[in-house]
């Protein structure tokens, strides 16, 4: 397994607070859909509640504790009800391309025929992405721990 640095991203829409993003590369013998189902189960265990549709009322994004995406799976192109690979919007997202460029800058997107570094260089996204500050990466005490101090 390899992991990128963690990046801090400005919130989209009218959400508040920083978002933290990173990319990991893993090897697995699982089929892509099984891996995706396990990722969704992990989100549920961590407290993520998915709602129908990607956006809440009035077109605003919802805050969430965790969001796991399967960006690529070998060199496969997958289009099923629960899984689209490569991720259909990764080329529009600096918060995906910046950490991914650390791990696989030369990886070619099979549909767009462009490398990760080329997509990142050509991106016109207004959202700022920077390496995360160390204080954002330290575990925070739970409310219970904080109240006993």
Task: Identify what each model region corresponds to.
Residues 1-8:
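A short beta-strand-loop structural module common to alpha/beta enzyme folds
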Residues 11-20, 28, 33-36, 40-149:
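Flexible, gly/pro- and Lys/Arg-enriched active-site loops
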